[in-house]
């Protein structure tokens, strides 16, 4: 059975809540061999989007980045609705997970200890955030 995860992105989820019209979701599907994590990010009403990253940390606390999903670009791009897709492998892991197998990231996600953060030029600390949860 495939492992799937979902993340709902909202400004209210930031450690210091952000009042924004922006929103989004991120969906993840782990490959059957566990070596690749496919993702699909959809963001809405983001002005000057610069990057999207997975971080290690529980809800309500900031933690270190573990993988880039988009960017870092400068200047940022403004979009009404945008979709980014890609794959993460162990080679893409950074920070505390650099050099480790992808299974370490999956362990953090499964434990509720990973989140997606969306950054913009206007909210350099993060405009949207959401914990990554297993789809049951």
Stretches found by the model and what they are:
Residues 1-52, 56-136:
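Metal-centered catalytic cores of metalloenzymes
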């Amino acid at each position: 059975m495939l492992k799937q995860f979902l993340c709902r992105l909202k400004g209210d989820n930031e450690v210091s809540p952000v009042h924004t019209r922006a929103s989004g979701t991120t969906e993840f599907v782990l490959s059957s061999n566990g070596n690749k994590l496919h993702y699909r990010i959809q963001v809405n009403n983001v002005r000057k989007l610069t990057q999207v990253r997975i971080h290690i940390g529980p809800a309500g606390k900031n933690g270190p980045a573990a993988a880039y999903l988009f960017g870092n670009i400068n200047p940022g791009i403004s979009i009404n609705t945008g979709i980014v897709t890609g794959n993460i492998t162990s080679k893409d892991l950074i920070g505390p997970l650099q050099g480790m197998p992808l299974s370490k990231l999956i362990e953090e996600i499964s434990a509720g200890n990973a989140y997606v953060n969306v950054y913009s030029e206007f909210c350099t600390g993060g405009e949207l955030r959401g914990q990554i949860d297993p789809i049951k």
